[in-house]
Every structure is written in structure tokens, then in C-alpha cells.
Amino acid sequence: MQCPSCQNTDSRVLESRAADGGRSVRRRRECLNCEFRFTTYERVETVPITVIKRNGNREIFSRSKLLHGLNRACEKTGLDTSRLESLVEELELRLQQRTGKEVSSTEIGEFVLRDLKQISEVAYIRFASVYRQFRGIDDFVSTLETLNADQEQNHLATVR
């Protein structure tokens, strides 16, 4: 492993432990040249997931791109970044477990919306407004009414 400080390739492992629920290994390393300490993560190499965009273009699934979009939707909502990282991790795991390695951006958006609805209504609305390309106030009102109706249904189901 190359040292990020001096680019030397000799290092020793100080500590190893499971991370991401056992899906990766976190290693604490020390460069043998400059004694700089750094952390690496090792995970199983997976078959890349291809995302089919709305316009028909295909691109490789980017967890960082999705996480960036979620961070934007969740700004100032008080949601912890680690919770969003977990959401992306869970989504990527679901996609990897599918038999086909192609997924539409629509499916990804719906997965994210379903999960966000459980975590934060504000983040759900903000993400939905971009993902569903809201054109005006009517789109917001319609989504809020649907969200409210879902809440009432869930409340009635728990009361019974």
C-alpha cells in the first residue's frame, strides 16, 4: 500500500477489524519510511452496476454521486452523514444482490425515496423535488398530500 504522505510502498499493519457490517476490512497502517499513519479499507470487488439514465445513456453506478445528492437533500435537516452513508451502502448491497447488473435511475430514485420517507419527511420532499423534476407549487402540494395520507394510513394501522 502506497503511503499518502511520501508514496513509499512499504507499510506495516497496526490494526485490522471488520467494517460495514463485515462487508469490508478496516486496516490502520504505518509507513516504514516516514512513520505516517493512515487507514485503508479492503472490500470484495464486485461486478459494476450499470445505471440506465432517463435519456437512455448508461453509466457506472457511483455511490459518491448518490451520496452527494443525498447530502444536498438533507442539508440543515439534522440528519447524520453516517446515516446517509448507511442508506447508500444498503442500496448498493441490494443492487449487487440482484441477478441483473443493470438498473434504471428511476428504480434507484424510488428506492432512495422509500428509505428517505422513513428517515426524514423534509429530506424526502427535497430529494423528490429534484428527482421527480417538480415544475411548480402544485407538484409540492400533491407530494405533501400523498405523504400526509400515507402517514394517516400508517397511524390508523398502528391504532388497530
Curated annotation (Swiss-Prot):
Domain of life per record: Bacteria
Cofactor names: Zn(2+)
Keywords: ATP-binding, DNA-binding, Metal-binding, Nucleotide-binding, Repressor, Transcription, Transcription regulation, Zinc, Zinc-finger
Zinc finger (unnamed) boundaries: 3-34
InterPro entries named in the record: ATP-cone_dom, NrdR-like_N, RNR_NrdR-like
Domain ATP-cone: 49-139
UniProt GO BP: negative regulation of DNA-templated transcription
Keyword Nucleotide-binding: yes
Note on cofactor: Binds 1 zinc ion.
Record GO terms (molecular function): ATP binding; DNA binding; zinc ion binding
Role description: Negatively regulates transcription of bacterial ribonucleotide reductase nrd genes and operons by binding to NrdR-boxes.
Family indicated by similarity: Belongs to the NrdR family.
Protein name as catalogued: Transcriptional repressor NrdR
